[in-house]
Amino acid sequence: MITDPIADCLTRIRNGYLSNILIIEIPYSKIKKNIIKILYNQGFISSYKIEKINNYKLLIKVALKYNKYTGTSVIKCIKRISKPSLRKYCNYTNIPRVLNGLGIAIISTSKGLMTDKIARKKKIGGEIICYIY
């Protein structure tokens, strides 16, 4: 049984880019889909697709993105911040900058998941899910 499905999702992505795998599969949930959608919009992954398996189970297939010149992954580090055992919250004035603005922080707010830049612009705080750079 998985106690932290978000950490499982991030670990699958991390294991995928460390092993130079092109496509990974993640069990579906709404929050995982929103995290993957943010990664796609920010350019960290090349594509994603939601597929049905056996007419009832959903999977998210994620195509990881690699630098075409060096072959290295676009994602250098993906780190879970708020854990089930220790939640990390911040208001919009204390939202951390990841690598001085080069990376992103995914924040769960009352308006849904969003990046740190959008949360600062909308003046909304929330739970810091992860850092990606």
Curated annotation (Swiss-Prot):
Gene3D superfamilies noted in UniProt: 3.30.1370.30, 3.30.1490.10
Entry keyword set: Ribonucleoprotein, Ribosomal protein, RNA-binding, rRNA-binding
Gene Ontology MF, one: rRNA binding
Transmembrane segments: none
A Gene Ontology cellular-component term: ribosome
Superkingdom of this protein's organism: Bacteria
PROSITE patterns in alphabetical order: RIBOSOMAL_S8
SUPFAM superfamilies found in the cross-reference section: Ribosomal protein S8
GO biological process: translation
NCBIfam families (alphabetical): PRK00136.1
The family this protein is said to belong to: Belongs to the universal ribosomal protein uS8 family.
Subunit: Part of the 30S ribosomal subunit. Contacts proteins S5 and S12.
HAMAP family reported for this sequence: Ribosomal_uS8_B
Protein purpose: One of the primary rRNA binding proteins, it binds directly to 16S rRNA central domain where it helps coordinate assembly of the platform of the 30S subunit.
Protein name (database record): Small ribosomal subunit protein uS8
Source species of the chain: Karelsulcia muelleri (strain GWSS)
